[in-house]
């Protein structure tokens, strides 16, 4: 059995807005049916008003259906309301859950509760915050300023994927 992939990308308050859109688009739309595709986007509240509209518009332009918490829907109204089951969903489709968080601790708690230990990513320019994310998140592959889509047998130099589990 291969690993389930409820993969997250966390956009930290210090994230470079210019890098957010291309990384998020790749993580969700490059191959949405893959187990390493992002299923939930977490955004720090301080950067959400600036970053979420740009990211959400780009996702919608790529055909992604968005499901957000109340705070996300207040910033970008063109999304459905997320239910608890959305946070645990491996959609394997052009559907993405979006949640606004107050801190790195809240993002890590969300990942710990709903993640599957497959692949997690943080977008940040703060080295200490990146190190803390790397140290504290429990996943087989953890990225800084990169797409979760890099978790791949070929990219890791392991050859073709035939039911390779990348879970811890």
Regions found by a protein language model. Give the residues of each.
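ALDH superfamily catalytic-core signature
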Residues: 1-93, 144
């Amino acid at each position: 059995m291969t690993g389930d992939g409820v993969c997250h990308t966390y956009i930290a308050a210090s994230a470079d807005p210019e890098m957010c859109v291309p990384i998020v688009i790749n993580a969700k739309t490059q191959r949405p049916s893959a187990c390493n595709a992002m299923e939930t986007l977490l955004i720090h509240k301080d950067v959400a008003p600036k970053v979420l509209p740009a990211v959400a518009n780009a996702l919608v332009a790529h055909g992604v259906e968005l499901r957000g918490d109340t705070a996300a829907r207040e910033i970008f109204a063109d999304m459905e309301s997320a239910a608890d089951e959305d946070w645990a969903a491996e959609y394997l489709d052009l559907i993405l859950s979006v949640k606004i968080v107050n801190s790195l601790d809240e993002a890590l708690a969300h990942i710990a509760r709903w993640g599957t230990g497959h692949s997690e990513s943080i977008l940040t320019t703060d080295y200490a915050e990146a190190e803390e994310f790397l140290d504290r998140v429990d996943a087989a592959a953890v990225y800084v300023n990169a797409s979760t889509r890099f978790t791949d047998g070929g990219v890791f130099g392991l050859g073709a994927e035939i039911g390779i589990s990348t879970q811890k």
